[in-house]
């Protein structure tokens, strides 16, 4: 810190980098204060104060102004002082003059650490005057790069009644009254409103208009204009051209007009209206990364053109309307700083728009309007609504906790409410509703913990509430909520694979594919994950495929109208498969371990429970049904119902109950080792026992009891009718020289054993035992009982047929 005092002569005084006090005294002095907040006194004479960019806050105690008017007296001229600014940005266009009480503060727009305070000085006393007659030019301020007055500026005094500026391409400072002033055509005017409620019209040219304090109206006119409202409630109209329009702290109205405009009310607390007009505009009501938020309720209207509308770091309830064109709309915060807490409305309008809401806590509405729009809602806590509108839209939400509504509208849309962000997996816990609307839509709530509702509506839609497993024994990213998926009309795919919830899937009209499956193999090809919930799958009208493969839950599958295929392969739960109406149905639960119930439709059904270990109940209906329970371990019940049915329980080991019902049924138990019960029911049935001791009842009708070999257990035939029913034997399986056709008379013996070498079948009418002897009474083969009939039957060779 230095105290520097000049002489009464013309001194050149240089300060230090500290806060100095410099007094030039009399004479025409040149004072350069340098860094630090300095106090400067020129003394008498025409003094020049040299100020460099970033020198700090300097105070001049006795600055001599030009004064009012354009003809200062010789006495005034003798005391006029000059400030010489040096440094980038220290120009007349950037000059800002602020009357703060009795002092005038000089700063520059966009320049930091640069300020001069003129003590006891009025704004109207500051001016630059060009030479006039015999009077030379006199200047209070010379700007960077100048040696004389080039960029002049003009200050209207407090009594001025001017309605227009007088000089083209100049800088004008108004007084603190309510001024109504216009610029000049074809002139790049800079007009500063200062205080008062001013109306400033730049006319044509690239103008810079500043409102200052007060409720101002700024009109840019034709040209690329810059309008700055500053404090209070301002109306800013850019007009034609590419304009920059900046509001302030009040409730401002900004209109860009035609052209590619930039409208800005960043960090404002007011309720502002921004209207871009025609052109590709940028509208900003932006807070900042460091926590300074926009707190007002702002309205941003893009108008025609490809516009960018942003209200990030905002706490107000904002409306962003893109209008026509391909627009981008954003109301977002960030992870480290602020979140958007208001209830915002984003409307894309006509065009291919992008709508974003990230790190938001309010209940927001995002409406894309017509066009192929893209929506991104992430890290959201509120209950948000996303509406795609007409067009092929993409609606995507990420890690959210609210109950969101996503509606695709017309077009082929993609709707996703999944809890996954890049390579970071997390869950979406809200209860979301996704409506596809018209078109072929994709709806997903993968990795979700909420109870979601998905409606495909019209079109061939894909609906998914699935989870994910990662690698051999890796992480599970599972959907846990109880979701409802409605396909609607069309050929739809509904998927809740890798889910832990109890889901409801409704295919609706059309040929649909519904699945609640889930499996993943480890490195030894062992299944280590299955779907866990108790799911309900309803195919609806159409030829549908329903699958709960690799499921641990007890699932209900209803085929509905149409020819359906229902699967529960490798499932462990107790599933119910109902084929429903249709001409043909396939019900397939092979390799399952649960106790499943399979109910066919009215016509043709195929039932497959092969290689299952549970005790299954399978019921046909009135049609022609096929039952396959090959190599099963459980005790199954198979009911054919009306119709000509075929039952195959070959190689099964359980004790099965098979009821043919009405119709001409065929029973095959080849290689089955359990004690099976076969009931033919009404109709002409063919019953074949297995390797175990089976119970065969033909029921009403003319039945055939078939035997493939004599050494496959002793089967009990409870109701054999000797007048018209047949015992069918295999020539290959029995041997003994049997020939195809009706058994020869000599090959049947009624008694306890054979008494000739030609006799092969011996019926003990006292006990009902039926034996086979390959060589009759030759003695080389001991007779084997292979069936037990009722006693006292009048059997003849006509009751036996060899095949």
Functional labels for PLM-detected ranges:
Residues 73-75, 96, 718-720, 753, ...:
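A general structural signal for short secondary-structure junctions and capping/turn motifs
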Residues 1-11:
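Short, intrinsically disordered N-terminal pre-domain segments
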Residues 10-93, 187-748:
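Acidic, glycine-rich calcium-binding repeat modules characteristic of RTX/beta-roll
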Residues 93-99, 103:
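Short boundary segments that mark the start of a structured unit
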Residues 181-183:
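LRR N-terminal entry segment and analogous cap-like coil->beta motifs
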Residues 1-2, 102-175, 179, 751-803:
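Low-complexity acidic/polar repeat-biased segments
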Residues 66, 100-101, 123, 721, ...:
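General N-terminal targeting signals
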């Amino acid at each position: 810190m230095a105290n520097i005092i000049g002489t009464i002569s013309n001194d050149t005084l240089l300060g230090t980098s500290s806060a100095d006090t410099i007094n030039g005294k009399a004479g025409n002095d040149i004072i350069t204060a340098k860094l630090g907040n300095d106090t400067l006194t020129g003394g008498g004479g025409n003094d020049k104060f040299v100020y460099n960019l970033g020198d700090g806050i300097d105070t001049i105690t006795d600055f001599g102004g030009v004064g009012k008017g354009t003809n200062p007296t010789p006495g005034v001229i003798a005391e006029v002082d000059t400030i010489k600014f040096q440094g980038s940005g220290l120009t007349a266009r950037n000059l800002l003059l602020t009357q703060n009480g009795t002092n005038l503060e000089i700063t520059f727009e966009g320049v930091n650490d640069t300020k001069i305070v003129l003590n006891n000085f009025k704004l109207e006393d500051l001016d630059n005057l060009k030479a006039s007659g015999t009077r030379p030019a006199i200047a209070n301020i010379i700007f960077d790069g100048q040696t004389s007055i080039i960029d002049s500026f003009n200050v209207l005094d407090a009594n001025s009644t001017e309605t227009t500026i007088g000089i083209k391409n100049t800088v004008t400072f108004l007084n603190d009254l309510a001024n109504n002033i216009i610029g000049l055509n074809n002139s790049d005017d800079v007009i500063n409103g200062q205080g008062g409620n001013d109306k400033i019209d730049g006319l044509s040219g690239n103008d810079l208009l500043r409102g200052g304090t007060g409720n101002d109206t700024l009109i840019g006119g034709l040209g690329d204009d810059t309008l700055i409202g500053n404090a209070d409630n301002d109306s800013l109209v850019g007009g034609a051209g590419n304009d920059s329009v900046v509001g302030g702290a009040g409730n401002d109205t900004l209109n860009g007009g035609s052209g590619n405009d930039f409208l800005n009310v960043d960090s404002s607390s007011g309720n502002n209206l921004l209207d871009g007009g025609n052109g590709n505009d940028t509208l900003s009501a932006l807070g900042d990364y460091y926590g300074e938020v926009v707190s007002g309720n702002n309205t941003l209207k893009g108008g025609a053109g490809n516009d960018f509308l942003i209200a990030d770091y905002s706490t107000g309830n904002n409306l962003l309307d893109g209008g026509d064109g391909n627009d981008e709309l954003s109301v977002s915060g960030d992870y480290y700083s602020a979140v958007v807490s208001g209830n915002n409305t984003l409307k894309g309008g006509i065009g291919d728009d992008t709508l974003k809401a990230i790190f938001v806590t309010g209940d927001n509405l995002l409406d894309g309007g017509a066009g192929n729009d893209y929506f991104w809602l992430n890290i959201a806590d509120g209950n948000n609504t996303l509406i795609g509108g007409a067009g092929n839209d993409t609606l995507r939400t990420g890690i959210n906790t609210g109950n969101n509504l996503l509606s695709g509208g017309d077009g082929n849309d993609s709707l996703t409410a999944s809890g996954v962000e890049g390579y970071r997996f997390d869950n979406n816990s809200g209860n979301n509703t996704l409506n596809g609307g018209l078109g072929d839509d994709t709806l997903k709530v993968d990795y979700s913990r909420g109870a979601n509702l998905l409606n495909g509506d019209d079109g061939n839609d894909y609906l998914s509430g699935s989870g994910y497993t990662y690698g051999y024994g890796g992480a599970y990213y599972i959907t846990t909520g109880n979701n409802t998926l409605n396909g609607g009309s069309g050929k739809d795919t509904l998927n809740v694979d890798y889910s832990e919830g109890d889901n409801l899937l409704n295919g609706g009209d059309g040929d649909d594919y519904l699945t609640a499956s889930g499996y993943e193999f480890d490195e030894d090809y062992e299944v280590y994950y299955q779907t866990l919930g108790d799911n309900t799958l309803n195919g609806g009208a159409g030829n549908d495929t329903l699958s709960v493969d690799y499921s641990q839950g007890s699932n209900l599958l209803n085929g509905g109208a149409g020819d359906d295929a229902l699967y529960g392969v490798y499932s462990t739960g107790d599933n119910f498969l109902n084929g429903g109406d249709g001409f043909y149905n396939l019900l397939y639960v092979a390799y399952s371990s649960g106790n499943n119930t399979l109910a066919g439709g009215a016509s043709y059904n195929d039932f497959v429970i092969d290689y299952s270990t549970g005790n299954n109940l399978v019921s046909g209906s009135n049609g022609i049904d096929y039952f396959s329970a090959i190599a099963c371990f459980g005790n199954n019940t198979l009911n054919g119902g009306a119709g000509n049915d075929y039952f195959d329980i070959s190689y099964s080991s359980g004790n099965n109950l098979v009821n043919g019902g009405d119709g001409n049924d065929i029973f095959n138990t080849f290689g089955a080792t359990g004690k099976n019960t076969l009931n033919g029911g009404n109709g002409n049935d063919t019953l074949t026992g297995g390797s175990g001791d089976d119970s065969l009842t033909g029921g009403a009708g003319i039945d055939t009891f078939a035997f493939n070999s004599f050494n496959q257990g002793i089967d009990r035939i409870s109701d054999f009718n000797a007048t018209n029913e047949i015992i069918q034997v295999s020539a290959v399986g029995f041997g003994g020289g049997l020939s195809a056709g009706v058994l020869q008379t000599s090959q049947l013996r009624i008694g306890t054993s054979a008494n000739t070498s030609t006799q092969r079948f011996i019926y003990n009418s006292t006990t009902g035992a039926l034996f086979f002897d390959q060589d009759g009474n030759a003695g080389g083969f001991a007779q084997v009982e292979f069936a037990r009939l009722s006693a006292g039957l009048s059997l003849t060779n006509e009751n036996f047929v060899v095949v």
